[in-house]
């Protein structure tokens, strides 16, 4: 089916996304389930064991920040993350420790972090599940202290033969913290989380308003939605 362009609009914006926060217990349980299928109890049990082995800080925390007096400690930990996460390209990341510091949002215990002992001992002797959890905690530290992700987003709207067509494309400008997240998922996560499998309609880079569209081939396809998944304990921990 050839489509003849009649009217179009092109909107291009520079956008950015901010790094995620550090983990508290709830957010770590949720992410461990999302990436590895661990139940909340299994995650807590493993965290408790890692804590007793002095590889992570206290796990039963509801804070996602650290205090100002921990600035130097966190700075040192971030600098040593290549020891535990050698697959990351640290040249793309940069870091900003101030992002994770907020005295007002730390009560009894700060966010979950790897420890200096973890760097010294290494994690190669851990079970596969514990190693997954340790790398999840470590990569979150790198992401949370990373730079912003910046990208150029282009939306086009075309009016053709009485029908509206839209498409969106994104071109990364600065990967920032996402460089760590992507490397972690490629290295450590076998199955991609469902919410990340959706693809946006792609458009050619450099598209400008007023350009002539080449004829395109179109076809109709049939898709089916799936019923919601049964509730599990992790759903009740969501914000």
Task: Give, region by region, the residue ranges found by the protein language model.
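Short amphipathic alpha-helical interaction segments
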Residues: 38-49
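Short acidic, hydrophobic short linear motifs in intrinsically disordered regions
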Residues: 19-31, 58, 230-235
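Short helix-coil junctions and helix-kink-helix linkers
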Residues: 29-38, 238
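Structured, non-catalytic alpha/beta "coupling" segments that mediate domain-domain communication
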Residues: 145-195
């Amino acid at each position: 089916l050839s489509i003849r362009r009649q009217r179009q609009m092109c909107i291009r914006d520079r956008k950015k996304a901010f790094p995620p926060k550090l983990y508290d217990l709830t957010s770590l349980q949720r992410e461990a389930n999302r990436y590895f299928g661990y139940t909340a109890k299994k995650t807590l049990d493993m965290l408790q064991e890692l804590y007793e082995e002095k590889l992570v800080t206290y796990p039963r925390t509801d804070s996602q920040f650290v205090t100002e007096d921990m600035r130097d400690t966190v700075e040192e930990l971030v600098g040593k993350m290549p020891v535990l996460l050698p697959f990351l390209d640290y040249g793309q990341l940069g870091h900003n420790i101030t992002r994770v510091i907020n005295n007002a949002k730390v009560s009894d215990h700060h966010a979950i972090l790897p420890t200096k002992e973890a760097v010294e001992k290494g994690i190669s002797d851990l079970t596969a599940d514990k190693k997954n959890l340790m790398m999840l905690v470590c990569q979150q530290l790198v992401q949370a202290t990373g730079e912003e992700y910046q990208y150029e987003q282009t939306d086009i709207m075309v009016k053709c033969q009485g029908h509206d067509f839209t498409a969106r494309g994104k071109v990364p400008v600065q990967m920032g913290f996402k460089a760590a997240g992507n490397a972690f998922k490629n290295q450590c996560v076998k199955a991609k989380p469902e919410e990340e499998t959706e693809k946006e309609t792609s458009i050619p880079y450099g598209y400008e308003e007023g350009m002539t569209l080449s004829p395109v081939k179109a076809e109709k396809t049939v898709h089916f939605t799936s019923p919601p998944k049964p509730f599990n304990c992790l759903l009740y921990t969501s914000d």
